[in-house]
Swiss-Prot record:
GO terms for molecular function: NADP binding; shikimate 3-dehydrogenase (NADP+) activity. It comes from Pyrobaculum islandicum (strain DSM 4184 / JCM 9189 / GEO3). Involved in the biosynthesis of the chorismate, which leads to the biosynthesis of aromatic amino acids. Catalyzes the reversible NADPH linked reduction of 3-dehydroshikimate (DHSA) to yield shikimate (SA). Homodimer. It catalyses: shikimate + NADP(+) = 3-dehydroshikimate + NADPH + H(+). The active site is at K64. Pathway: Metabolic intermediate biosynthesis; chorismate biosynthesis; chorismate from D-erythrose 4-phosphate and phosphoenolpyruvate: step 4/7. InterPro entries: Aminoacid_DH-like_N_sf (IPR046346), NAD(P)-bd_dom_sf (IPR036291), SDH_C (IPR041121), Shikimate_DH (IPR011342), Shikimate_DH-bd_N (IPR013708), Shikimate_DH_fam (IPR022893), Shikm_DH/Glu-tRNA_Rdtase (IPR006151). GO terms for biological process: amino acid biosynthetic process; aromatic amino acid family biosynthetic process; chorismate biosynthetic process; shikimate metabolic process. SUPFAM superfamilies: Aminoacid dehydrogenase-like, N-terminal domain, NAD(P)-binding Rossmann-fold domains. This is Shikimate dehydrogenase (NADP(+)). Belongs to the shikimate dehydrogenase family.
Length: 260
């Protein structure tokens, strides 16, 4: 069986192959997972090839939203989110899921319930974070982005879809939970004063992002990009293979790949 992660600039940078191949070996499953750089214009062609050659694949930047329209079926939560990061190939049909959202919910829902949540970003990961925060019954959800208009459009879409108040904000906002749903790792993207939890989707080139270091300095609980990568990857393997993988093995493989 063959699996892959697709995106741009993922070959040699994504830790997913190391993580999944270590897991497959531990599970005794004869499978190989690779990273494939797929430009935007080649996405439709790749998907046709995937139907015949892959058992499943992960989707990362910049395809998480675009891929949805090419799939044969999409799980209800992923459809509501408007983004897919995990695809199962079943009888040559492409079925989409969002394990970014379910991973974040699994790891952080207890912190988000009744809390003010700030999400940085407006792409596929931000959509997953918005869904997880709403599902966890956050008290208030704010979204900020370098391009304010994108944050505003996303806030409006989710507010209408889920009948919950979601606000786009321009400036710094204090929140109980702060989530960086961008790949930015070397800059301060939000105010952490007053936060009890910081979540970071970024792990390349290191999970010790500038924001993670700031959170640790302030004594704030951290869920970093490796934690999220492992959890969403474990949930993806359960979808593909129907098994519960060993997350400890997966995390060890990621840390070794990153040289940590």
């Amino acid at each position: 069986m063959y699996f892959a992660v697709i995106g741009t600039h993922v070959r040699g940078k994504s830790a997913s192959p190391a993580m999944h191949n270590a897991s497959f070996k531990t599970l005794g499953i004869n499978a190989v997972y690779i990273a494939l750089d797929v430009p935007r214009e080649e996405l439709p062609c790749f998907l046709q090839l995937a139907r015949l050659n892959l058992r499943g694949f992960n989707v990362t930047i910049p395809h998480k939203e675009e891929v949805v329209k090419y799939l044969d079926s999409v799980a209800a939560d992923a459809r509501a989110i408007g983004a897919v990061n995990t695809v199962l190939v079943e009888r040559n049909l492409l079925v989409g899921y969002n394990t970014d959202a379910s991973a974040l919910y699994q790891l952080a829902s207890s912190h988000m319930k009744g809390a003010d949540v700030l999400i940085v970003g407006a792409g596929g990961a931000a959509r997953a974070a918005l869904f997880a925060a709403i599902k966890a019954e956050a008290r208030a959800v704010y979204i900020t982005n370098r391009t304010y208009e994108r944050a505003e459009a996303l806030a409006r879409e989710f507010a209408e879809k889920f009948k919950r108040e979601v606000k786009a904000v321009r400036g710094p906002v204090k929140a109980d939970v702060v989530i960086n749903a961008t790949p930015v790792y070397d800059a301060v993207v939000a105010d952490l004063s007053g936060a009890s939890l910081y979540v970071d989707f970024a792990y390349i080139p290191t999970p010790r992002t500038k924001m993670v270091e700031e959170a640790q300095r302030l004594g704030i609980k951290v869920i970093d990009g490796v934690d999220l990568l492992v959890e969403q990857g474990a949930q993806a393997e359960k979808i593909w293979l129907g098994v519960e993988p060993d997350r400890t093995v997966m995390k060890r493989a990621v840390l070794e790949f990153l040289g940590i």
